[in-house]
């Protein structure tokens, strides 16, 4: 599928979600002076701190261009937030002249839910209707990875390296500082968060 996508000029993207913690420190190695090991502080959130302990983020890696697109979420990833992320991705790719995105992602419940599958079907039907009228649009071809195989998703190592790169060893970052560091590391603009629907 990836070879076909490349021959056809389609975009290929590996999508996933990740939590960026303000408290948990990543496992990492470092060099230090003899007898003076570098230690990461155990961080705690005070009761007055209103920021969340962790921020959820959707991401898409486009391996051919080495581009990562990020979109943070208010709350956690759920089906309707996933469809909002996919809609945003389509707008981004359409502005670059892309017509098809081969979307490679795992079998998370919010990827394979009835709501997301119906949205994908309706979206692709509306794309075909738009193409018949000469309107540009981006079709999505989802490819689900086998269960229990996150290492097949090429965006996963980027999350690990990103967490190590943005670490703050001695103090607790605010949610805004954390988001800015993540976006700076990946070279992405800070954009509005995807918000869950309020019933």
Predicted feature descriptions by range:
Residues 1-87:
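Extended, low-complexity cationic-aromatic segments
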Residues 8-10, 138-141, 148-199:
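C-terminal anion-handling pockets and recognition modules
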Residues 17-21, 62-66, 108-111, 148-151, ...:
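Short, solvent-exposed loop/turn segments at secondary-structure junctions
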Residues 23-26, 112-117, 155:
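A short acidic (Asp/Glu
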Residues 37-48, 123-157, 170-171:
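RNase H-like polynucleotidyl transferase catalytic core
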Residues 81-102:
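Short, basic/hydrophobic alpha-helical segments
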Residues 97-112, 145, 153:
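Acidic/histidine-rich, metal-coordinating catalytic segments
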